[in-house]
């Protein structure tokens, strides 16, 4: 810490699980600032040990009320005349250090200083230092402070004089695509929740227009086209982040998932009994689940009376999923060594004893015609020359965006147990049919895809990561241009070919989310193959 006589400078940070970043950022400031104040919000890594090894004062507040209030609380611990607000992933360069030291020789009055920040993503610089880099108000007299915003917080300037410092902060935004996407989705949700709490209603035109403007601004106006492939990746990711913000806000106002759920419960309660006395084949219902207490009962209500056994393989539920399953006579098994959806379905099937397997997820429900069609199959001896598919109708945020008369997924879900099983794929697993044809059954399988848009987007990120790692393990590669065109095609397929355009605003949101998912997984795969290259 600095001991020279001058006005005191306090560095103020808020952190959570930032140990890796603190190892880089603290050495750049520890020997010349007067104090380092760090306010933690619940870290489980060794960040405190690292911080204290550099003389930082560590405080904790887990009552999170947003970034703005957390910065206010952190600043309250500071004793300096000047405040330098930093994030753990920001590194002060030597030129910036010298600029700061010159400023704090002067008494703190009414001047707030902006600091230009160069962003890095996955270790690559994505801002061009010669292209009008934006300054952030980070060095200021202690009498100033941050606003109350949950996200996108900033210093309240009032009538302050503003100046910009020479030198740069190096901002290491994310070490991996997965980290960036998860972090920005958290920001998008917090932003949407904050606006919704203020009475703001999401407008659909902003879901369409604002992401387009975000790309133009990030890639062209901010000069990231000068930074090659990583400048493009960042601009595409930021466009997706902007879409997520406005789409999540729209969903908070217009979501119909709870209505669709209650309708599915009522449907399950009003199904007619099925005569199963003429069955010649037995049927095992096979399910994999985790924390499905909300959906499982309604699912089992539509199927329990036509099957001979119910097999449930759980992967670590902490709710009352087991009690619900066992109330329907289910045989409960557990495997928490998760190896992907395909392997988990194989393990679940291994517990079954019926002639046929019917595979369902907890958020799916059989309608009356499909119940009857399955029972009709069981009236014959087990058939091994074909598998049976069901037409699945998806409700997205409670809306059936793809009209069933236009498009429905055809999924092989009913098959001879000893002759077929699911593939090993971690995500997007499917039945190995070994060249045997499928016969589509009458009726529909209703699928309650998600409770809200954020839940859907979060799953998409996880599935993208699983898909990319699986392909990388099998020595698959791709190019960025191929990933871009695949993403565009996925939008066309969803919006036009599958009829999302008939689903109104949510049809567009689903098509855009699908495009984002495709883009993410190919960028992740490309990055895995190129991360060690300059």
Where are the predicted features?
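N-proximal low-complexity "stem/linker" segments adjacent to membrane-targeting elements
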Residues: 1-28, 253-302, 534
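A conserved acidic beta->alpha catalytic loop
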Residues: 28, 40-49, 87, 302, ...
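Short, structured coil segments at secondary-structure junctions
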Residues: 32, 54-55, 158, 306, ...
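Catalytic-site signature of metal-activated, phosphate-bearing donor transferases
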Residues: 68-75, 82, 93-258, 263-276, ...
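Short, acidic, metal-binding catalytic loop of nucleotide-sugar glycosyltransferases
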Residues: 25-36, 301-310
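Conserved donor nucleotide-binding strand/loop of the catalytic core
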Residues: 48-77, 308, 322-351
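Acidic helix N-cap motif at the loop->helix transition within catalytic regions
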Residues: 20-23, 45-54, 95, 294-297, ...
